[in-house]
């Protein structure tokens, strides 16, 4: 399916984002129109995840493992956020674990040429500063530097587009980095 879809899309000069599929295996080298793969426990999973799901730890682990295979269609950008103690699954008002700033940092840390929005448009209307940042952040970078990190604890990435640098950092909820 993937090869046929990529080939057909290329024939018609269309880009492909394989959402809900396995990790990249090199198909995008043959078909550069394939720009993204999900293959992660993306944020939409939090709608039905139970209180034992630790998305914060997952988010500081995934870049070291899954992202090595290629771009990630993660669906970040939740505007309704809670700490682990207050988090609960909800189909009506889904939320993320962590903070809104954490959600914004994921746009820098996670490599994704086609970023998604996981939340309701009305939530973005209420958070104008966040929405402006998401709308203007580049999705393709000229330079990337992994500044520091430890699997499952923290990660800091710096990415440059033109003369502008963006720095994003994700940590565990209770970690202190000196």
What are the language-model segments listed below?
Residues 1-95:
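Aromatic- and carboxylate-enriched substrate-binding clefts and catalytic-loop regions
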Residues 16, 109, 167:
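Conserved, mostly hydrophobic/aromatic
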Residues 175-177:
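Conserved small/polar residues in nucleotide/adenosyl-binding loops
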Residues 93, 102-121:
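Catalytic domains of carbohydrate-active enzymes that cleave complex glycans
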Residues 13-20, 43-48, 115-127, 141-145:
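Acidic/polar loop patches that form or flank catalytic/metal-binding clefts of enzymes
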């Amino acid at each position: 399916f993937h090869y046929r879809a990529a080939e057909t899309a290329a024939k018609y000069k269309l880009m492909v984002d394989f959402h809900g599929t396995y990790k990249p295996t090199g198909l995008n080298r043959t078909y550069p129109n394939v720009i993204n793969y999900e293959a992660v426990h993306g944020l939409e999973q939090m709608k039905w995840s139970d209180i034992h799901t630790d998305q914060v730890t997952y988010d500081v682990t995934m870049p070291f493992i899954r992202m090595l295979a290629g771009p990630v269609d993660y669906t970040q950008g939740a505007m309704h956020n809670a700490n682990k103690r207050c988090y609960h699954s909800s189909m009506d008002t889904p939320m993320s674990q962590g903070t809104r700033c954490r959600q914004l940092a994921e746009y820098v840390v996670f490599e994704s040429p086609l970023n998604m929005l996981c939340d309701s448009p009305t939530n973005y209307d209420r958070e104008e500063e966040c929405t402006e940042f998401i709308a203007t952040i580049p999705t393709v970078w000229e330079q990337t530097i992994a500044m520091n990190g430890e699997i499952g604890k923290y990660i800091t990435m710096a990415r440059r587009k033109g003369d502008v640098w963006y720095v994003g950092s994700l940590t565990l909820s209770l970690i202190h980095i000196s």
